[in-house]
């Protein structure tokens, strides 16, 4: 299982993903689910993947290969003219991989499903954020929906819905995502550390902050402990129910 979140902030884009994959309680591995491509001064693009590991690895490999040796120079992550075209390229590649794997196997296409979050900025345009579905179609983040999640979303979603503000700083947004991930980690063993973090600041066209947060990270554990304590204190302060 996977948990990925991307926030569209006034100051840029923030991405976070876990790294755990599992095929049962006795077969747990760590795989990167966040990938970044950049051309300094021109573009930064980040992709996060959730779903069938073979599918997502094939998609990332194809996108990489076609960026190096493009059949159509405009149809690569490093040359697409807009982020919309980037999202369409990712969707087409995902659909291609799913159809190819289904044709070679004996099971339904849904077995090979995956969902992808793609965001970034190309010079001359605003940062954009998309959620790509297994069918290859996609939606874009907006003022009404300024964040996307993929994978095991239900445990960490209420925290983001209550506290997220696009005007918040990167520091506060990272704290918010740490709380969201902490809630998910405690509720679902299929989501696990380390976490990958990428903060892209608007109009810099540089990769920005990229960090792996290990399971023994002291700041993450401080956030987890302080959040748990603050939640208990908040519950104590709520009015009592009359019985």
Kindly give the residue locations of the regions a language model identified.
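N-terminal nucleophile
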Residues: 1-243
């Amino acid at each position: 299982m996977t948990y990925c979140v991307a926030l569209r902030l006034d100051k840029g884009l923030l991405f976070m993903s876990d790294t755990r994959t599992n095929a049962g309680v006795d077969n747990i591995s760590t795989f990167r689910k966040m990938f970044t491509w950049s051309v300094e001064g021109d573009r930064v693009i980040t992709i996060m993947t959730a779903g069938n590991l073979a599918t997502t690895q094939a998609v990332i490999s194809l996108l990489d290969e076609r960026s190096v040796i493009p059949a159509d120079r405009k149809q690569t992550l490093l040359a697409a003219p807009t982020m919309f075209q980037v999202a369409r390229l990712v969707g087409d590649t995902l659909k291609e991989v799913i159809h190819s794997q289904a044709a070679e196997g004996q099971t339904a296409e849904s077995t090979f499903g995956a969902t992808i979050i793609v965001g970034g900025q190309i010079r001359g345009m605003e940062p954009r954020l998309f959620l790509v579905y297994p069918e290859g179609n996609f939606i874009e983040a907006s003022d009404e929906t300024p964040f996307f999640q993929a994978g095991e979303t239900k445990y960490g979603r209420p925290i983001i819905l209550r506290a997220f503000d696009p005007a918040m700083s990167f520091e506060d947004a990272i704290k918010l995502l740490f709380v969201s991930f902490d809630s998910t980690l405690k509720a679902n063993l299929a989501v696990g550390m380390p976490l990958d973090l990428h903060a892209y600041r608007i109009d810099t066209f540089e990769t920005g902050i990229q960090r792996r947060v290990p399971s023994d990270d002291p700041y993450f554990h401080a956030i987890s402990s302080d959040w748990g304590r603050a939640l208990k204190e908040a519950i104590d302060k709520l009015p009592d129910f009359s019985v």
